[in-house]
């Protein structure tokens, strides 16, 4: 499903740069947000097939953004080095990806996620 538009929410500059490079190299259109406020703005501007959000961010929680994106009909994933500490109740509706993630694992996870049926948007 290359060509799909992805929103990546990642506050670590080095991690973000690598993930964007890998995803764009695989043919995906990627928009980067470095904080929750920027991600909210991007979600209001455009539709995304997939939103990948870091869990712990300086100005909020990536799960909140993933929940909003899912309500808009996007597929969602949480990418975190702390994934094992997440509450199953809060993260149940999202894919959970562990950091660090290898480029081949990232692409496989994105392809798997995009191959799933979309969550219907809330009315």
Placement of each model-derived feature along the sequence:
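Acidic, metal-coordinating helix/loop segments flanking the phosphotransfer/catalytic sites
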Residues: 32-50
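Acidic catalytic/metal-coordinating carboxylates
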Residues: 35, 61-64
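Active-site residues of response regulator receiver
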Residues: 54
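Hydrophobic/aromatic residues positioned on beta-strands within the core alpha/beta folds
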Residues: 79-80
């Amino acid at each position: 499903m290359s060509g799909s538009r992805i929103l990546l929410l990642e506050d670590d500059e080095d991690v973000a740069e690598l993930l964007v490079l890998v995803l764009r190299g695989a043919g995906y259109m990627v928009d980067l947000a470095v904080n929750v406020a920027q991600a909210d703005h991007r979600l209001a501007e455009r539709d995304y097939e997939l939103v990948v959000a870091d869990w712990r961010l300086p100005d909020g929680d990536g799960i909140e953004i993933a929940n909003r994106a899912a309500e808009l009909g996007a597929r969602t994933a949480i990418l975190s080095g702390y994934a094992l500490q997440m509450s199953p109740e809060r993260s149940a509706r999202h894919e959970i990806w562990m950091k660090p993630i290898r480029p081949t694992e990232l692409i496989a996870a994105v392809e798997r996620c995009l191959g799933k049926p979309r969550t219907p948007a809330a009315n």
